[in-house]
């Protein structure tokens, strides 16, 4: 019996092992039932690292095992107690004996061991289907294995029971908010972790249409430049992760915080040491589909992601803002913190945990972390403000690396979170609680003409290129400028060239030469000068209209004022800065005082404005075309005086204008009658009750071609606007094939005549003006090179501008001297009509002086007209006599007496 008891005790380990293992492996049916019993047992909720065998074999388990398992007590039970030497010995491997010294683990060794144990227990638990991802341990570890683990877990979940279907729902049905709001849902741990994983996977795997990894290249470029902003296209996010794109505008603050954390992990996975440069990566959202106007922002936009546009009118300096703040207890010098400072409220400690005192507390300047802070104000773009409305403005906050991304005068697109904050001054002013609103910027993009070109469709581009191949496109564009204004072809030609503009040059980044063409209109009252400016304001993509009487020097350039809240000096942009890359229109230019007028000298030539006030020394861009209108001294233009004697402007300001247009109100019975008919017909045609021609007033062909115009059909105004935008952005004409000798000869001739007549001074600026106008004429035809025709047109415009500013006594002789330049692209009939009108005017003056009255019929001998025509190389007048131009001006021929008659 002693031997049997010894053998029983010696074989007890083997017996215990067999009792556990044999029933589970006896048959496949039993194993499946046993697995069900295991997964549903109370041991599922036991804490880790405990002996789980007690939970697996509970009180109910053995009862089922005795019914279904093998019979252990019987005739063959002695076999269970037979000695098996290899199984009757405990394993000694890995066990430390009592007499052995065990070395104490270091911190790194202990951490590695615990990581291995956690990995083992996690795999063991998942193998049994007992635990879900992220519940036992922090699932933020081993990020490199997560995508693969996630796929394996989803595959296992499809094969397991109802318990694991809940896990699939939490991953696949993230859009099911379960009755919560979006902001509450994304703040929970489960959805927050899933959003983190999805966005991280999006950054790692998103490819473009060519198969290139988009964000790998962007992150590489970002790290090369040591930046901390990663731009994500909202359209790409919506295409891949539509749930995240749905959550983002509703809860932007929470989502962007998760995105920033995920982006930082992706960046550190690619560049592990990038945290030495920055500890934060900011995800910037671009191309948000819906663009809101500043005046349309309402309370429903609060705390949502919005996209708006406007012009920056003022900006503060870059200030340090508290990010992570630490406090010193003044009584015990204990350091409290760090406290994360948010934009909405100030965080202050209540009591000191060391001495239990309630303060006072001082900010620890050395250990506190700051971030960059800048406040800007954006205003609605001038072209988007409805008539009679004041432009709205809104403040925006730029943080981190967004500071100094724009300056006053820039037109920007701003994506950010629309916040409200408490403002005590508003409560005092209104008498009841209201909140001020502000935009916390997330992404800032400068707008230029490329955005305008991007709005053109393929059909528009095809139509524009087709129009450029028309031989008469130049005349059509000239005729399309202000078609509701009668006559003034030279002014329309100059304004058309100014709208297209030349090409700016900056050789080596040292000296910048402007490409914009400045135009000055001067003449008698009632000659449509202001109407021309108003027309340019409508047809230009970006225009600022101001008057000389109401504009001061700082109103035109820029000024410095103290911010009412922060009490610091801020820079405010004036009209010329706001019109950057556009047109600045100044009416009543002569009403400005000299001090205000000299302030725009730099803006008109160097196209920049230097500010040195209140400690702010800077330079702002003013790359705009200046078109001004002025009245002569005394109200009417005196042709017996030169231009500079008629206008109260100094020579430096006159020489900065490329084109000078003199508008004179001369008495001509025929022209006056035609003008009156034109005006009356225009009023009748555009009356609101006239429904028949309603379509023409909305951008169609406004007026029929008049005989004194270019004789071609004008372009619709919308087509003209698109044509100008396309030409200014896509065409860059070069001067390779330009006739330089012709320009040099003409410049020397102009200098001689200028010195002899004492009229406006001719300077080197006029050579640059001719080059700019030649480039503008080439751009008008969408040509890449300046041709001889472009140079001839520029010389003709320059000559007409120069001759119109002369005294009447020298104007005729000068026209004869420069006739070869003035005759370019002019129809012979136009030249002959001009000569014939001069002969009629001389005859009218003769009759008034001799008879004291004017006769109803003026007779001009054909021989006089023939002699004048031969001087400009025109020998055949039959085509002129048969033309409509001859008949429309009420001329007729008496063939017997060989006279030309005009009836008044």
From Swiss-Prot:
Zinc fingers, C4-type class: 329-355
Chain residue numbers at which the record places covalent cross-link Glycyl lysine isopeptide (Lys-Gly) (interchain with G-Cter in SUMO2): 178
Protein encoded by which gene: Mcm2
Compositional bias annotation for Basic and acidic residues: 76-85, 111-125
GO molecular-function term, one example from the UniProt record: zinc ion binding
Region (Interaction with DNJC9), start-end ranges: 61-130
Extent of Low complexity compositional bias: 1-12
Function: Acts as a component of the MCM2-7 complex (MCM complex) which is the replicative helicase essential for 'once per cell cycle' DNA replication initiation and elongation in eukaryotic cells. Core component of CDC45-MCM-GINS (CMG) helicase, the molecular machine that unwinds template DNA during replication, and around which the replisome is built.
Protein name: DNA replication licensing factor MCM2
Skewed-composition ranges (Acidic residues): 62-73, 88-104
Misc. remarks from the entry: Early fractionation of eukaryotic MCM proteins yielded a variety of dimeric, trimeric and tetrameric complexes with unclear biological significance. Specifically a MCM467 subcomplex is shown to have in vitro helicase activity which is inhibited by the MCM2 subunit. The MCM2-7 hexamer is the proposed physiological active complex.
Lineage: Eukaryota, Metazoa, Chordata, Craniata, Vertebrata
Residue ranges occupied by any MCM domain in the UniProt entry: 473-680
Modified residues (Phosphothreonine): 25, 39, 59
One of the record's GO cellular component terms: nuclear origin of replication recognition complex
The enzyme's E.C. designation: 3.6.4.12
Alphabetized PROSITE patterns for the sequence: MCM_1, MCM_2
Region spans: Disordered: 1-166
Organism annotation: Mus musculus
Subcellular location: Nucleus; Chromosome
Gene Ontology biological process terms in this record: apoptotic process; cellular response to interleukin-4; cochlea development; DNA replication; DNA replication initiation; nucleosome assembly; premeiotic DNA replication
